[in-house]
Amino acid sequence: MKKVFIALMALSMVCVEFTSCDKDSGFTADPTTQPIAGKTYRETVSADSYSQFSFHMNYRCTMEAKKPGESPVANSYFEWWMSPGDNEVVIRYAQGAYDKTTGKSLSGQTFLSGSYNATQNTVTLSGDFDGQHFTYTLKEQK
């Protein structure tokens, strides 16, 4: 099991931590995903928010989403994949995902989605969490 820490922070101080990833989870790396596999991306747009991704494509990871000082509101797995045709990037809740507060299933729902720009080597992601919309532009850290 590969240990990974990923945090997304924004002005509302929502923090999403992907606390562990398992390369033997049954997800396989598609050759079309390799341009961003295993690289680290950091947000470059806003000084008020911070994002860092350091993991391999198509790993399944444990996720806890929470606000500072609060219990996690979701505990699930996510899948990160990239469409070979249009460089679409999607992070979605995998089978078994659920909202800890309501108990409602989140399986298959999109958490963040966006695209990979091969020219600028950036990933742009957007999505909704806890009633707020977030947009992240991530650039590979050399």
Predicted regions and their residues:
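Contiguous, well-ordered beta-strand patches that form the walls/edges
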Residues: S46-D48, T62-S126
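Sec-dependent N-terminal signal peptides
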Residues: V4-M13
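Bacterial Sec-dependent N-terminal signal peptides
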Residues: V14-T40, E140-K142
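Short, low-complexity, Pro/Ser/Thr/Gly-rich segments in the mature regions of secreted, periplasmic
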Residues: G131-K142
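Positively charged n-region of N-terminal signal peptides that target proteins for export
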Residues: M1-V4, D22
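A short glycine-rich beta-turn/N-cap micro-motif
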Residues: G38-T40, M57-T62
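Tryptophan-anchored aromatic micro-motifs
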Residues: A29-S51, F78-M82
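Secondary-structure capping and domain/repeat boundary segments
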Residues: F53-F55
